[in-house]
C-alpha cells in the first residue's frame, strides 16, 4: 500500500520532535511573573521591589523595561554552598526612575537562562510610596498616612480589609485612584482576579463615598472634604476574597484629575479650544 507523501513527512517531523524532547528540556520552564511588591515606584527615586513568579528566577541577569527613563537591575543572589541551582520564586529588583520620566504603567520582563519571563507591570507615580504595614484591618488599627501619597499593599487573604487614616481640611479636594485589577490582565497564570472596592468614611464611621467599578474593575473617588478632621480609606475585595498576588496602588492627592478632553478629534490646519473634563479642575 502506498503512503501519502504529506502524511509521511508529518509523521517523520513528529517523530523527530518527540526524539528531541528530553526530561531536561521539559523542566526548563520560563518564569511566569505573578506580582511586584510594592507595585509602584516614585519619580526621581531608586527603590527595591520584590517580584514573585511561578517557576525558577535563579540566574536572571537583565530587566527589560518599556519606555524610557525607567531602568531596573537584578539584585545579586548569593550562590549556594553546595553549588546546586536553587529554585527561586522571588527576587529583588532595583528600579531607578528619572525625575522627568513619564508617569503611568510600564511593562517589564526578566531575561533568564530559561528564557524571557512573562510580562510584569509597575506604576510610575509622582508622590511618595507608602507601604501597607502591620495590622490595619479595622478602623481602630488603621494605618496613619499623610497625603499626597501612593499607597501600596495587597489584598492577600480572605476577608482582608486594609484601612488607612489621614487628616484633611474643609474644602480640600481629594482623589483616590486604584490600580489593581487592570494590572492583572498581563499576568499569565493568575486564575482568579481581584475585584476591589474603595470606601471613604468620616472618623465617626459615616460613609462619604464608595467606588467599585470605575476604570474597568478598579475604583476611583473624587470628593471635597466636608469638614476639618480625620478620615478613613478602606480597600477590600468586594467578595471578601484574597490572594497574595493581588497587589494594589492607590494614588491619593488633591491635584486636578483630567480624564479626557473635548473635542476628541481635531482637523489638521485648524485652531481648536480644548476643554478638559475631569475632577477638581476649578472654574
Residues covered by each model-derived region:
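Bacterial N-terminal signal peptides that target proteins for export
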Residues: 1-13
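A short beta-strand micro-motif common to beta-rich folds, especially ectodomain repeats
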Residues: 101-112
